[in-house]
Regions:
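A mid-sequence, solvent-exposed acidic-amphipathic segment
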Residues: 148-177
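Short, contiguous alpha-helical
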Residues: 16, 24-64, 102-159, 200
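Acidic/His-leaning functional-site neighborhoods
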Residues: 168-198
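Hydrophobic/aromatic-rich structural module bridging two neighboring secondary-structure elements via a short loop
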Residues: 55-111
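Alpha-helical packing segments of well-folded alpha/beta enzyme cores
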Residues: 14, 18, 48, 78-81, ...
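Non-cleavable N-terminal signal-anchor transmembrane helices
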Residues: 1-25
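Amphipathic, non-membrane alpha-helical segments in soluble helical-bundle scaffolds
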Residues: 4-12, 35-42, 71-79, 109-112
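C-terminal interaction segments
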Residues: 189-228
């Protein structure tokens, strides 16, 4: 897991870049989330920032929905929403008890990690408006891949949201020179994807087509996480 100082740097940096991309064309369509305009995306992230700030401060329920921030309001408050989130994350000890909806440690560190990846993916989304999104930083993407399996797949199976499979997904992460093996949740026939950490994280989050990185094995397995 990325340490807290790096997490805060990443959240702040990606949060600012997201705003820059949206403000360059707030009415532009987010290619990776075509139902959203840039202004809609900014409003969504403002809602996430407000929700998590309140949760860390003990003012929100873990099962509450993100506040629905009107796009016109978010255009004015986003910078302050982001700054409050970063400050609250900085001031909250990683081992402080904070409720979480997932099968994960119920501590602030779990949310600090989630915020990094939320902002990284949505920064990438925002930059699709201009047509040339920069990759997610390798260290962030590697941890984002780990979080996907450790938190989302585990919770999805435990909650009955995704059917368990006797199958194994192998990720060959080219820029890191590593190979990650994930059972879903039982060992079975292997399906292999190969790509950079950023590309594979984005494929897991349905921002990139996983078939573009398919090497061998059951192509149908690549649809398995779409219900998570």
């Amino acid at each position: 897991m990325v340490d807290l100082a790096r997490q805060l740097e990443s959240i702040d940096h990606d949060g600012r870049r997201l705003a820059e991309a949206v403000r360059a064309n707030p009415d532009g369509r987010v290619v990776s989330c075509p139902d959203w305009s840039g202004a809609d995306l900014l409003a969504h992230v403002s809602g996430f920032a407000r929700y998590l700030t309140d949760l860390l401060a003990g003012r929100a329920d873990r099962n509450a929905e993100f506040p629905k921030v009107p796009p016109d309001e978010a255009a004015q408050t986003y910078d302050a929403d982001l700054a409050r989130l970063v400050a609250t994350l900085r001031d909250t000890p990683p081992d402080a008890e904070v409720p979480h909806w997932a099968v994960v440690q119920q501590v602030a560190a779990s949310w600090q990690r989630r915020a990094v990846h939320e902002l990284a993916v949505h920064r990438w989304d925002a930059e699709t408006i201009g047509g040339d999104p920069a990759p997610i930083d390798q260290d962030v993407a590697l941890d984002g891949i780990a979080e996907f399996f450790e938190v989302f797949v585990t919770t999805g199976i435990a909650a009955g949201l995704v059917a368990p499979a006797r199958a194994t997904l192998v990720l060959e992460i080219t820029d890191a020179g590593t190979r990650r093996v994930e059972h879903l949740p039982d060992p079975g026939p292997e399906t292999t994807l190969r790509g950079t950490a950023s590309d594979l994280m984005l494929a897991l989050w349905r921002r990139r087509d996983p078939l573009a990185f398919h090497v061998d094995g059951r192509r149908g397995l690549l649809e398995h996480w779409h219900s998570i």
